[in-house]
Amino acid sequence: MTKNCLNQENCIPIFSENSSGDFFSCNPWLLFFNRNKINYQIFSLKKNDTLLFNSSSRLYIILIGSLIITKVLRNTHKVTLNLLTTGDTFGQIELVDDNFYYEAEAIDKTEVACINYTTIIKACSNCAPFNLFFVNHLVFCSAKAYHFIEIISHKSITSRLASLLLLLAEQNGTQVNNGIMLNFTITHKILAQIIGSNRVSVTRILANLLKTKLISIQKKRIIVHSPVLLSQRILNQ
Amino acid sequence: MTKNCLNQENCIPIFSENSSGDFFSCNPWLLFFNRNKINYQIFSLKKNDTLLFNSSSRLYIILIGSLIITKVLRNTHKVTLNLLTTGDTFGQIELVDDNFYYEAEAIDKTEVACINYTTIIKACSNCAPFNLFFVNHLVFCSAKAYHFIEIISHKSITSRLASLLLLLAEQNGTQVNNGIMLNFTITHKILAQIIGSNRVSVTRILANLLKTKLISIQKKRIIVHSPVLLSQRILNQ
């Protein structure tokens, strides 16, 4: 359809769903980059490793893992902007001035692919299916930000934590016999950082949720027993 | 460059900045739709008029005015997701289930253009400059959501209100001799709705900001005298 697209027909099936086989060989972004000989870098982050970014010229794609995105206002304070997981991207935030920068902190073992943003834009104009994939991805990014807004719109820390657990259970949970188990371990300190609180408060609230049997811990992972009952806990605040 | 794009060369200058002349004749979206004979509808909303949307099949473009986007969870509560102004869009949020819907409430006289989302996607594939414009717009949408997160990440209502006034001054303000005047009048009730509070609290906090001369009111509009001093008020909470 466009003369610049060398193998458009080849790149259509890349964006079909494929959850079997080796993870990296079926990641839609990497499949597309590899088939079209597009250069990218891979960063492997351990838990608590932090990636600083203050330029909108690169796009970071989370291949696997989870990161907290934070805006750091120089000499003042930090604001947690989002919790991103496998398939999410960051880096395409505008830069206003020198008064702040962004950082991404891994909350689990995380692999990130990094690519120049101009390369992505060029790929969009050269390959219509990739362009559609990218447009849909950007719409999904806004939706993801709105999910985070639903968590922190609560003023009460108990409501924020219950909302976060519900979102994690929905997006990063696996059904087990007595509820939904989170796919990763998460420290009280990280939970506090996400919801803008402190470790002590989070430990106290989790102890209460455990006592009232709304959650339990198994193999160091949180299990949400009943999303309905937990969501009622939010409204009762 | 692509055989489907009838007048690609013509549509390039549409996306250049043009702030002179009649507003609607130089709106980039309308210019593009009109030149390419793309159908759209215009809705004129008065203050407090509400537009319900529970489908992601249409894109709404704010031609002029301001709206609050709210997620309404059936039988339970509402969450304000964002404050959108001239040039912003909404509607492209995913629909998960029947437990909620979205509404957009005008906080000022507002004109909205509405177009089928499939038409936008088709236009993207037919016209490369429009596609680039739309991709940049979607990136901007995420950034806008992050601005809102910065406001409601505060647990204190005073900090949320001060953050909101700073954002409004930056994005919807005009420099006057003694500070930055907001471009529209806004009621205490609407301010409360945006930050998840009530009218009484907002009135009390605004009275305090007036008393300490951080803001003043002129022609029913709020003037922020010093963004620096007001931002310090946030940190002191």
Swiss-Prot record, chains A, B:
Signal peptide: none
Stored SMART domains: HTH_CRP
GO MF assignments: DNA binding; DNA-binding transcription factor activity
Annotated region of DNA binding: 188-207
Residue ranges of domain HTH crp-type in the record: 155-228
Stored Gene3D superfamilies: Jelly Rolls (2.60.120.10), Winged helix-like DNA-binding domain superfamily/Winged helix DNA-binding domain (1.10.10.10)
Record has Lipoprotein as a keyword: no
Origin superkingdom: Eukaryota
PROSITE patterns attached to this UniProt entry: CNMP_BINDING_3, HTH_CRP_1, HTH_CRP_2
Gene Ontology CC annotation, any one: chloroplast
Primary localisation category: plastid
Keywords: Chloroplast, DNA-binding, Plastid, Transcription, Transcription regulation
One Pfam family from the record: cNMP_binding
Compartment(s) of residence: Plastid, Chloroplast
Protein name: Putative HTH-type transcriptional regulator ycf28
Organism of derivation: Pyropia yezoensis
Organism taxonomic ancestry: Eukaryota, Rhodophyta, Bangiophyceae, Bangiales, Bangiaceae
This protein's encoding gene: ycf28
